[in-house]
Structure formats: structure tokens, C-alpha cells
Amino acid sequence: MKLEGIYSALLTPFSEDESIDRQAIGALVDFQVRLGIDGVYVGGSSGEAMLQSLDERADYLSDVAAAASGRLTLIAHVGTIATRDALRLSQHAAKSGYQAISAIPPFYYDFSRPEVMAHYRELADVSALPLIVYNFPARTSGFTLPELVELLSHPNIIGIKHTSSDMFQLERIRHAVPDAIVYNGYDEMCLAGFAMGAQGAIGTTYNFMGDLFVALRDCAAAGRIEEARRLQAMANRVIQVLIKVGVMPGSKALLGIMGLPGGPSRRPFRKVEEADLAALREAVAPVLAWRESTSRKSM
């Protein structure tokens, strides 16, 4: 089973009433396949999972797996505050045909380090699927290198989703545990992550620019660094506008610009305005031109 590679942190399409648009899931998953990415990471931050009930999250895991129908590698994010809820989602992911699970640390309460470590050990012990630890210090308690090394010593913990700008720590993880899979988590630092040893990347903007990041990965692997830097800069121009607009609603708006259903984000995320759409269209135009040029060359 190949778990390395480029994964979109799959968005969740909503209808105008903020219910999950189940009719749109197939089109979104089909687009991920056409982008040529390796898989999808379902139910994470980009999917607005923390704005959903457990039943909604479980249903979405099932719907995405059915739509993918074996065409993509599937990683289910099952992270929650409560260990029992993460275990429930983990069991559901296994039944739905996922290849791995991932989990952010328990948050909101000031859990002790032993409590956080015990949470992961129990999840890894019980899960029928391999576990990828989600290291996201900007949103939850981060991990020290010794803590990550300890977690990765568990036979069912196979990797780290490193959503951090700390490239020193990323490289030290790769050095300390060479067999672990390390996924870069910040899209705007994808090339840096690969340069420091990441074997994969999981990102929000891969939902609509996954083909660009596949090309970036291939250029980096082939030593074509200037070309990879050019692709990273092209992506970063889009990301810079997304940060101003709001990454979640802006990303869904970009799906709409590309003719795909995304819908709004759930409140309290704001609605995208016309001025935002104009800025997003301008920013993504070079990516669309690159895609068209690349498509012509491959014909």
C-alpha cells in the first residue's frame, strides 16, 4: 500500500442552507482524480469537520469512499476532543474502505502531555488502520521531537502530517525515524518540505491546484529546482489572496470559478463578495493558463 504522495485535504461542499450537498460529492472527487493527485485526506480542517456533527462526518467519509471507488488512496481524519469519538470515526473509516486514519491532538481543554500521548496510543492500539499523527501547533498543542519519536515507535503509527513552518523539526523527524512518512502540511511551503525530506504533502489548495503540486513534486525529485520554485511562486500568489479573502470560503469560491460545486462555508465563516471573486480570478488565471498549456503539450 502506497501512502506517500500528494493529497488534497478535501473540502466539504455545502448547500445554501449549510447542509452537506451530497449530490456534489461525486463531481468534487472526480475532479481530484483528473488532477492526478495520489489521494484525499477527508474530514480535516479544510473539510470544516469541526463544524460538523459526528454523524455528518461519518456519512461524509462513506460518501467520499463510494465516489472514489478505488481510484484514490483515502486517509480519514478522525480527530476530535474526545477519545471515544475518535475511536468511533476510526472504526467507521475502516468499514468504509479507507487506507489510513489521521488525528489532530485533543484540543480546547488544557490536556496534559501524558493525556495527549495516551490518546494517541489508545487510538493506535484499537484502530484497524495505520495512524498518521497530525502536528498542527498553530491550532493545538504541538509536539516536541522526542514526543514524535516516541509516538512513531508504536507499530501502528506510521507518519506525521507536519502542518508547521518548522522545517528544522521536519528534517529531524526524517533523520530520527527514517521509515516514517512525513507529509508537509503548509501548501505555501511545499517545495521547502520536499527539500527537507518530506515524502508527501497534504493541502487545501490541492483541491483545485493539485496538478500543479504534482508537477512541483516531480520537478523537485528530478532536481529541476528553478522550475519547482516557479510553480511554488504561482501557487503562492493564489494563497496570498486566499489568506486575505479567507482560506475556507475562498477555496470553495475557486472551485466555483472552475465550474465545480463548492457552495458556502458554514457560519461563522463569511460569504465571499464580488470583489473577492475578482481578486481570486486574477490570482488563479496563471494557474489555469499553465494547466491549459500543460494539457496541450500532453496531447
Curated annotation (Swiss-Prot):
SUPFAM superfamilies: Aldolase. The active site is at Y134 (proton donor), K161 (schiff-base intermediate with substrate). It is found in: Cytoplasm. It catalyses: aceneuramate = aldehydo-N-acetyl-D-mannosamine + pyruvate. Keywords: Carbohydrate metabolism, Cytoplasm, Lyase, Plasmid, Schiff base. Pathway: Amino-sugar metabolism; N-acetylneuraminate degradation; D-fructose 6-phosphate from N-acetylneuraminate: step 1/5. It is an enzyme of class 4 (lyase). Catalyzes the reversible aldol cleavage of N-acetylneuraminic acid (sialic acid; Neu5Ac) to form pyruvate and N-acetylmannosamine (ManNAc) via a Schiff base intermediate. This is N-acetylneuraminate lyase. Homotetramer. The keyword Lyase applies. The keyword Lyase applies. InterPro entries: Aldolase_TIM, DapA-like, NanA, Schiff_base-form_aldolases_AS. One of its GO terms (cellular component) is cytosol. GO terms for biological process: carbohydrate metabolic process; N-acetylneuraminate catabolic process. It comes from the Bacteria. It comes from Rhizobium meliloti (strain 1021) (Ensifer meliloti). Its EC number is 4.1.3.3.
